[in-house]
Amino acid sequence: MDTASPEEIDALKRHYLKKELFSLLIADELNFVSEPTNLDHLGSPFVEKGKSVIPYEKSQIPVLRFIFKRFILTFPFLDPDSQNQLWNVNFRNLLKSLSKSNVSVLPDDSDATHLHKWLLKFQNMLTLLMSRAFHSIQDEKNINIELLDTPKLEKDLHKSELQQKPNILEAYVLGVRQSTQAKMLRTKRVYEYLIKVSYEENTFFIARKYSDFSHFHHLLLKSYPNAYVPRLPPKDDHDTYLNSSEDSTLSPLPSRSSDTNDPQSDSQHVLRQERMRIELRQYIKNILNDDELHLTEEVLSFLTDDPVTLTASELTDINFRQELDVIRQLEQQKFVEIASQRAKELDVYMEEFKRSLTENNGFTTLFTELKEKNSISELSPSLQKTIEWARVNLASTIYDTFIGKEKSLETYLQIKKMHQLFPYTVIKNIMRFSNPLSVMKRILDTLLAQPFGMKSLFQRLLSISLNENVRAIHKLISRYEARIVSPEILTKIQEQVENPCKAAREVLEKKQMKRHDYLYFILISDDVPPKLPDNLIRRVYAERTAWKAALDSEDYPTDPTVIRRSKRYGYMMKLMHLYAKQFNKRRSISLISEGATGEIMKSMVDSPELNPNILVEQFIDLVRRHEDSFYDFVHRVYLHDSGLFASLMEWIENIIGFLRQGTSAPIDMDLVVDALDEESRQALDVELNKLLKWNQRKKSALFLRKTTKYIPGEETSLPVTMDELGIDEEIMAELRGDEDDQDENDQVTKVEEEHMEDDDSVEEFDPIIEERQRMKRKANRPANIIPPKPKLRTVKTLLPAFKEQVYPILHKFVSENEKDI
């Protein structure tokens, strides 16, 4: 962007100023309408009894009212005869429930942050709609890839390769062996992970249990409090099963007497702790790639002490797993290459398809062909190629969801639980109906029915993971409550989390306190009931002082009193976080039980175990086997349609037309800033420079994320770009947001939940160490994370002048094009 001309810079500033003002305008209107009593400003059907409809020109939310009337009320699947019940009763009640649930109970409350992200995505979607439809008299320009600092991006992209350490010490977790450990009344099966180590020209093997990894991890955290220690993966007891017929190309596995009682062992080979081995291998790799840790005394001791001699069966097991690693890596690489190659080959046909889609009545023409043709083979060549492209992308998505991603197993287990409850037979019978309205109505009736006042299937499906999470959190709460030994403190923390008093709410709304300061405030403030006795206030003061001292010191504290006090304060912070999570989860369950509606997606479920012989063709064939049946269903539904699909196509084309053509009158952005004095103009210019740099950094982060991470099925991998449909691709990327970013406390809680029943395998939670690590992770945010947005005080002052430009233009457009707004 340094090479851009002054005219281009001005056009960029103008564009992002307009977009920012639209974002502020829509946020202002959304904040107004978040109060259920203000819904009347959306016009009919939001009309309370005894009141008349508020005219459009007197509405406080004209933009939202326009969007609601033009794009939401006109959605074809909504029954015109039940609009009043749907919006004025059901939606109003739902908004009341959501407004109660949209209260943050903690500073940096992770659950409130998740809700805020969804609301922000909705706000960005509306910003996308309006900023593209309202043009400016002056030239505008947005940041594209040519304006990014490409050399710097390439440097960031290959940064990890440049940071590889000399091969002084190498270690690979290659195998797993099983032993037994005697307990008082029973024997326990224990697994040791076999690690091949190369150090100072010597190569040998060591064996380490998961508990050894846990002790080692805790030692690193304590010995190097200012270093970023990679996370130890949670314990995973799952084994991997390979069908005998599918691993014929691999070396034979050794027979094991311990497997004779396994019902699956006759037809399948068992790889014990395979997923855990892979994750621990990555953990060791991350440590050895860290400048501060890779040759420390602790690492050398862990990886070089007590070498072992392996048996023939253990060496055979290692060889088998190594062959599997090679096949797995080649398979994944081949899948990506073939899927990408297929998609590129289809680009030429996709260009033709995109052009036809964006023409007038493009969607109508498309679905008319689906109605007239009885099978895929009868479709036009371009549409057949489009279906082939969709087949490849869907196959990639299936592969990515159930195998390729780190969370694939977790996703599979969640879907499997829902799969066990889902009434496939009932849904199959419903799908026999050809009329789409009948199909949708009967499916909703099935999902939302509450026989004898019991929970509906929809509520049960959504509550599965929430209820399990609440039970796990309750166990953790009991564990930490036992360490505080002060009922008064526990009661006060829980009361202020679940029902903050006025003083606490004011602090939360200002969002100026960190979590440890907020805990101190609610415990000692006289304005926050109930008041603690003086001896407890003195204790809290001493513990908070010790906590700050422990975090501010370079090394881990050595004074036992400081350690005891600071840990207790950390436990109180942990409890406050757990109380908040438990409260938020229960609020979510309550909201579901109140009848909140949503969409449920049913997925085909099969075994998630990694098959070393899976190729891309098998996934594509999986999709191909079902596509004819799916097309036949769509064709028959459309054939018997009574106008619903035609209305849907018209509705979609209405949105695309509005985005492409926009309003008749443009905005004069120079007029918006005319009222500013010279000092304010200079301040505005500084803010716009910051806004421009932030957008450049954000776009660079999105580019890095797109380039370094293979995500099949995302919009970024689709040949159809949003810009070609009149949609801002940058905002679409922003809508996807930081899905990979997780709250640090959530991750710690999740790890603790994994080990609730296995206390011996994990070191005791140390709040001092964890807080240091959290701060270190926050300071070392990767390059592909969107940076915080700069504060824009002067830009906000332009909002009234901007509204004076936008509202009359919108009112004129409404008067010329709309009948009932």
From Swiss-Prot:
UniProt cross-references to SUPFAM superfamilies, sorted A to Z: PX domain
Location of the PX domain: 171-310
Protein name stated in the entry: PX domain-containing protein C1450.12
PROSITE patterns hit by this protein: PX
GO molecular function: phosphatidylinositol binding
A GO cellular component annotation in the UniProt record: mitochondrial membrane
Entry domain remark: The PX domain binds phosphatidylinositol 3-phosphate which is necessary for peripheral membrane localization.
Localization per Swiss-Prot or TrEMBL: Mitochondrion membrane
Protein species of origin: Schizosaccharomyces pombe (strain 972 / ATCC 24843) (Fission yeast)
Region (Disordered), start-end ranges: 235-271, 737-766
Modified residues (Phosphoserine): S761
